[in-house]
């Protein structure tokens, strides 16, 4: 394997149920070792945090806010565009140009689909708080803010 092409959602959920989730301080994000198995310590730590069950949540801001209010984080697959790279943690709606270019195989957007976990929301800001897997040096200490509008667009989430 020479490059990281991301992962598929359902095998990731199955892995969280089987192995669990290691804390970042035990197995930090490092893009140079994506193809290596985690350390035995990471497996041991992860075993204390296994996903117990998965629930399907309707793809709408209101349904996701309800799940969050009930104490459930929501994992989702986001369609990302080049503006994601320069967002500084505030994910903008893609421009019309970005969405049009994404249809051209020669100009495919860099990230494609990317799994992240929605962990909070602010009705005042009309944004979700989302945890990425790229470590604390990315975005706002590993988090980003995604507008409700992004989530409610079936072409983006």
Regions found by a protein language model. Give the residues of each.
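Predominantly the structural core of cysteine protease catalytic domains
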Residues: 1-131, 136-157
């Amino acid at each position: 394997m020479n490059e990281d092409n991301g992962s598929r959602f359902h095998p990731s959920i199955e892995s969280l149920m089987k192995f669990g989730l290691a804390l970042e301080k035990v197995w930090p994000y490092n893009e140079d070792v994506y193809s290596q198995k985690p350390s035995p310590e990471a497996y041991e730590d992860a075993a204390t945090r296994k996903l117990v069950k998965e629930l399907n949540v309707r793809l709408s801001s209101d349904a996701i806010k309800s799940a969050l209010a009930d104490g459930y984080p929501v994992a989702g697959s986001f369609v990302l565009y080049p503006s994601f790279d320069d967002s500084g943690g505030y994910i903008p709606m893609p421009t019309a140009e970005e969405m049009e270019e994404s249809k051209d195989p020669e100009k495919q957007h860099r990230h494609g689909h990317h799994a992240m976990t929605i962990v909070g929301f602010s009705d005042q800001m009309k944004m979700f708080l989302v945890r990425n897997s790229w470590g604390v040096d990315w975005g706002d200490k590993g988090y980003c803010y995604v507008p409700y509008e992004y989530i409610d667009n079936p072409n983006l989430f």
